[in-house]
Amino acid sequence: AENLSAFVHALLSFNPDIAALYDTIKAHYPIVLTRDMAKARAWLRKHTRGSQRSGVLVSKTAARFKPLVVDVLGQGDENAVHWFLMDKTDIRSSNYLEDAATEIQVQGLELDYTCVLWDADLRCENGRWRYFNFNGRTAWREEAGQTESSLERRKYMLNAYRVLLTRARIGMVICVPEGNSNKTVDGFPEDATRLPEFYNGTYKYLKSIGLGEM
């Protein structure tokens, strides 16, 4: 756990020693990378055995996960109890891999295996993080102000991924979606909220530090 925390801290802070840190954990703690949620689910199902638990995790500021057939777990203690405690035959269970929990719901708790679904709220571009909030309808808006409240929001968003990336005891898969590169008949993006460039930089960065592609 200590080595994983150090690795995640290095990953999020662009530490130049990140590849060496990954070498210290990869033999006993698998982390795999994919752009396909179907493959991520298959990996979790293959590795989760007996009474072990797996689950999908997303940040609270993630927004475009429905096209990947993922819902966010409803707020409230009852939903969280079902997600964490029901067995794999119960559709409310984390093991069903349909409802994703956020950093708020998993803070201080662990699963055996996780899939961290990395949305366009946190994007790696040119060796730094850019932060975005979705307006709920049509577009992402960058969180780039220099006010104290804006700086605090960016700090929270980065820490949310720190929480998500440290919830698995045994191993995890990180899914950075492909986005949608399709065009309408008029030549406009089919889905301007999931353009490939929102995700590609993050995927390339994670790949560059040595994470294996599925």
Model-derived regions: residue spans:
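Conserved helicase/translocase motor-coupling segment
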Residues: A1-W129, L151
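C-terminal accessory regions
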Residues: Y96-E213
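Short, Lys/Arg-enriched charge-dense amphipathic segments
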Residues: L11-A20, K204-M214
